[in-house]
Amino acid sequence: MDAYNNPSAVESGDAAVKSVDDDGREKRTGTFWTASAHIITAVIGSGVLSLAWAIAQLGWVAGTTVLVAFAIITYYTSTLLADCYRSPDSITGTRNYNYMGVVRSYLGGKKVQLCGVAQYVNLVGVTIGYTITASISLVAIGKSNCYHDKGHKAKCSVSNYPYMAAFGIVQIILSQLPNFHKLSFLSIIAAVMSFSYASIGIGLAIATVASGKIGKTELTGTVIGVDVTASEKVWKLFQAIGDIAFSYAFTTILIEIQDTLRSSPPENKVMKRASLVGVSTTTVFYILCGCIGYAAFGNQAPGDFLTDFGFYEPYWLIDFANACIALHLIGAYQVYAQPFFQFVEENCNKKWPQSNFINKEYSSKVPLLGKCRVNLFRLVWRTCYVVLTTFVAMIFPFFNAILGLLGAFAFWPLTVYFPVAMHIAQAKVKKYSRRWLALNLLVLVCLIVSALAAVGSIIGLINSVKSYKPFKNLD
C-alpha cells in the first residue's frame, strides 16, 4: 500500500522531515537563552577575579577605558562573525558548522589552515589551563580551612595533583556527551556558578572598602620606584592590557554556538542579541570586580583575590566561592573541548567512512540517565584527550603563563582579523573607502595590542620557568 493510501505513512514521513533541519542534520533546538548561557560560561572565567590586578597596573582612567573599549570591539566583531555563519547570504545561505568552514567559504586558501591552527591550539590550551585553575580553587578550599583553624600565618601546604586527577575523571565522564548541542544544561549551571563567585568577590571587596581598610590607589596605577621598577611597570602594563583583551574573547567558539540555534528566528539575529547580553553582562561584572577590587586592595591587588587569599574570612563563604569556580570550570572545559572533539571526529569519519570502530553508534541504558548513545572511538579518543591534558597540567603547573601567550597569538586573528576580512568580502566593502580604512585601522590597533601582550607574556613565562619546581605542593 502506498503512502497516498496510508495516512500513517504520510504522517511518519512528515515527522521525519520535521525532525531535521534544512541541511538534513538533526533539528537544532538552541535558543537565545542557551546561546547567552554558552557565551557567559565561555567569557566569565575565574580570570574575572584577577581584573583588580590588571586595573592596578593601568590605573583608574586607563583601566576602565581599556575594559569598555575591548567590550565594544569584541561585541562589534562578534556581530560581523555571526553574519558569516551562512554563506553567501546571512539568512538564506548555506550553513557553516565551524570557524574553519566560515573562513573556507569567504576567504579560502592558506587562511583556512591559519584559522585552524589558531583556533584549535587555543582551545586545547584553554582546557589545560582550566584543569590547573580548577585544582588551584579546590586547593584554596583546603588552605582556607587550614588558615581558619591554625591562623593566617600558619604554613598550609596542599598538593593540587589529587584535585587535577579528580577534575580529569569528571571530564572523562562529561566528554561522552556526543556534541555541543547537548551542553545546554551544563552551560546554564556553569553560568549560574560564574555569577555566584563573581558576586561573592564583589561583595567581599565592597565590605573591605566599607570597613575603611583599603589599599592606596592612583589614577595611573602602580608607582615606579614604590610598587614596581620601571621595566616591571612596562611589562606588567602590556600583560594587563592583554589580559583584559583576551578575557572578552569567545569568537573561537561563536560559530559552534550559533550552529546549535533553531533556524527561526534567523540565527544571526539571535546570536547578535545573545552576544550583546553576554558581553554586556560580562562588562558589568568585570568593571565591578576590577574597580571595587582595586579600591579594596590598591596597588598591591593580588592576582586572584579568592585563591591568592586577598580575603580570609568568612572562610565558609570563600570556600563556597572557590567551589563555584571549580563547578564553573567543569562546564567551561566542555564548552571549549567539544569543538575540538568534533573537528577530530569529523575528519576521522571522512577518512575512514567504513570503519565500525569510528562510525558505529551503540544504544545503551544508563541508570538515572536513560537511553544513551555510545561510540567506541569517541569513548577511547576523548578519554585519551582528557588524560593527556590532565597530565600536561600536572607537569607544567605554570601553564597559565603559556596560556597568556597562546591568547596573545589567537586573539588578533580569531577575534579581529578574520571577522573583519570576511565582513569586507561578504559586504563587498570598497577598497580605500572610509569604512574599509576604519576596519583596517581596527585590525592594526588590535595587532599591536596582541604583539605587546605577547611580549609581556613571554617575560612572565621566563620568570615562571626560573622558579619552576616539578611536583611541588602549593604553599
UniProtKB/Swiss-Prot annotation:
Cytoplasmic side: 1-31, 74-120, 179-185, 258-276, 336-378, 425-441
Disruption phenotype: Reduced seed number and silique size correlated with a specifically altered amino acid composition of young siliques.
Protein name (database record): Amino acid permease 8
Phylogenetic classification of the source organism: Eukaryota, Viridiplantae, Streptophyta, Embryophyta, Tracheophyta
Membrane topology: Multi-pass membrane protein
Naturally occurring in which organism (per UniProt): Arabidopsis thaliana
Annotated Pfam families: Aa_trans (PF01490)
PANTHER family (UniProt xref): OS05G0424000 PROTEIN-RELATED (PTHR48017)
Topology Extracellular: residue spans: 142-157, 207-236, 298-314, 399-401, 463-475
